């Protein structure tokens, strides 16, 4: 019953945040499986003891924050994941904030004329700017595709 409330809240609001909560790897996987089949992010190393979890880690030499610009997770996949489940294990002494915006709320706040115009648009999706995919045996030129601007 509690998980159904979580699902309902996610569909209603587009995001759920549980601040200062520890989520064990086992519980992380259990929660993810509740929403459907787990799609492990191919750009990050799976956790050895829990290969259904991808570890997003910044190295000490890294100057750019991973996903540091506005983005939608996995929009470059032909069938994007329904949601992402993140659990911060280490936080920097400052920063590290994640901000969220609802494209659905923005769309429904627009005039019907602007909505009609946007419905006709298509978007080009690619993972090429996200990571140097060639190091992973993935050819970015094979991945871009055009989709309606609104997926869901």
Indicate where each model-derived feature is located:
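Non-heme Fe(II) oxygenase catalytic core, chiefly the N-lobe of the double-stranded beta-helix
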Residues: 1-152
